[in-house]
C-alpha cells in the first residue's frame, strides 16, 4: 500500500540541498508563442526548460523525455516559476510552462456559493490552452512522452492542475501543487500527489480541499506544511523558500520516477554534456532544422497577426 505523509518542512533538513540553476551548459529555456486559430488566433505563450544532454539524446531517438506542465498563479506570468522548471529539467523532464490568461480575459472574480467560487470557466479555458500547447509542442519536441503528464501549479495554477487531473486521470503521472485553494484533491490513489502548503493567514484553502491525515495515508498523498507565505512560492520568493521546495520536489521525483535519470550538476556540467554512446549526427541536425523551420513559421504568423 502506498503511504501518505504530512510533513513539516524544515530548513535544517535541506540546508545541504543542491541548487538548481539554469547554467547555460546544462539547462536551456526557450519561449514560443502559438496562435490558436480555433479561438480567433488566441496567443498561447509557452516557455520550455530542458537538459541539453537529454534533449540531444531524445532528438537522436535514444530516449523519450517525460513531460511536466507548469501552471502559474493568478496575475503571475508563466515565466515566474523557473525555480520549479529547473528541478524538472535537471531530472530529465521537458518542463513546459504555459500562459493561461491574457489581458483581454479580464480579471478573475470570486463568487461565493458557486462551484470553485466561480472559477470553473478559468479552469476550462486553461485546459483548452494546455491541450492546444501540447499538440503544438508535439511538432517541436516529438521525442517527449505526452501520454503521462506531471501536472504542476501554484495557487490558481494548482487548482488548474488538480482540475485537469480530475478530468483526465488516465493522462496523469503525478500532481504537484503549491497552495491550491479551491479544487479538492483527488483521493482515489491513481497517481502520486505532492502539495506544499503555506503558513499564510490571507490564503486559506476552502473546506474539503486538503484531505486529512487519514485520507492522505490511504491515497498516498504527501502534504508538506511550510512556514512560507503564499507568494513566496515563485521566482520572486526568498531563496530559503525556493531552495527548500526544490529539495523536497527533487526527492519526490526521485522516489516517484522509475527512470534512472539523476539531476545534473548545473554548476559543473560543461564537461559532461553527453552520456557515453554514439549519437546519429545526421538525425540530430535534421531535427534541429525542422524545429527552426517550425519556429520561423510561427513567428511569421505572429507578426502578421500583430
Predicted regions and their residues:
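An N-terminal hydrophobic leader/cap segment in hydrolases
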Residues: 4, 12-57, 263
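Serine-hydrolase catalytic machinery in alpha/beta-hydrolase-like enzymes
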Residues: 33-144
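Loop/turn elements at helix/coil->beta-strand transitions in domains of secreted/extracellular proteins
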Residues: 64-67, 91-94, 146-148, 170-174, ...
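Primarily recognizes the serine-hydrolase "nucleophile elbow" in alpha/beta-hydrolase
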Residues: 134-189
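Short, conserved loop/helix-junction motifs that constitute active-site signature segments
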Residues: 185-190, 213-217
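Short beta-strand/loop motif that positions the catalytic acidic residue
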Residues: 194-197
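Conserved alpha/beta-hydrolase "acid-adjacent" motif
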Residues: 202-209
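C-terminal catalytic histidine-bearing segment of alpha/beta-hydrolase fold enzymes
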Residues: 219-298
